[in-house]
């Protein structure tokens, strides 16, 4: 008598696999969303890309944490096809799903990154602080920090606008009402002093 073999689901780490599947689905969705944004005829604002990238990074951290937390269970889990799996017609799919070795392209990429990392010197906190201070100073030199002009505009002789506060126009005794101050802070409306 040929009875179908019932799979034993007792030792399957369902919780670990489900949490991993959920995290992978989230990362896949975020990557697709980011790719769709980048392939639009006009790029979206950088803030939108930045937000999507931050979401993706958060999800990658969550995925990494899940893998680390479940690593013992996942390393001990062995997968195999059920007897009813069509191995003759789906041999390629089965080989891909059961693959233990990294794809050759991924292995080459990992080796390339390892080789590049060999030349990188890890900095101490003090060295990093010095480098950051130098980088900020270099960036500071690119701008005129006393107004709304770039270094290029200053070098080209563009004259900065002269801003005169309403009190200076009206004299020493001029006072602004609370409504005028709130209109300026909330809407940017310049107050007029009578």
Swiss-Prot record:
Signal peptide: none annotated. The keyword Transcription regulation applies. GO terms for biological process: regulation of transcription by RNA polymerase II. The keyword Transcription applies. One of its GO terms (molecular function) is RNA polymerase II cis-regulatory region sequence-specific DNA binding. Keywords: Activator, Nucleus, Transcription, Transcription regulation. InterPro entries: Mediatior_Med8_fun/met (IPR019364). It is found in: Nucleus. GO terms for cellular component: core mediator complex; mediator complex. Component of the Mediator complex. PANTHER family: MEDIATOR OF RNA POLYMERASE II TRANSCRIPTION SUBUNIT 8. Component of the Mediator complex, a coactivator involved in the regulated transcription of nearly all RNA polymerase II-dependent genes. Mediator functions as a bridge to convey information from gene-specific regulatory proteins to the basal RNA polymerase II transcription machinery. Mediator is recruited to promoters by direct interactions with regulatory proteins and serves as a scaffold for the assembly of a functional preinitiation complex with RNA polymerase II and the general transcription factors. This is Mediator of RNA polymerase II transcription subunit 8. It comes from Yarrowia lipolytica (strain CLIB 122 / E 150) (Yeast). The lineage of its organism: Eukaryota, Fungi, Dikarya, Ascomycota, Saccharomycotina.
């Amino acid at each position: 008598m040929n009875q179908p073999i019932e799979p034993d689901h007792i030792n399957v780490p369902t919780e670990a696999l489900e949490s991993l599947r959920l995290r992978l689905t989230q990362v896949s969705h975020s990557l697709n969303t980011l790719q769709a944004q980048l392939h639009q005829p006009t790029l979206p604002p950088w803030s939108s890309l930045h937000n999507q990238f931050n979401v993706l990074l958060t999800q990658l951290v969550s995925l990494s944490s899940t893998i680390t937390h479940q690593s013992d269970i996942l390393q001990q889990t062995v997968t195999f096809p059920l007897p009813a799996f069509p191995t003759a017609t789906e041999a390629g799919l089965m080989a891909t799903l059961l693959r233990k070795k990294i794809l050759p392209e991924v292995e080459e990429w990992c080796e390339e990154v390892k080789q590049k990392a060999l030349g990188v010197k890890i900095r101490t906190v003090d060295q990093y602080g010095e480098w950051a201070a130098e980088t900020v100073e270099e960036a500071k030199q690119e701008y005129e920090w006393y107004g709304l002009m770039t270094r290029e505009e200053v070098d080209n002789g563009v004259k900065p606008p002269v801003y005169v506060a309403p009190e200076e126009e009206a004299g020493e005794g001029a006072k602004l009402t609370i409504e005028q101050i709130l209109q300026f802070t909330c809407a940017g409306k310049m107050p007029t002093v009578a």
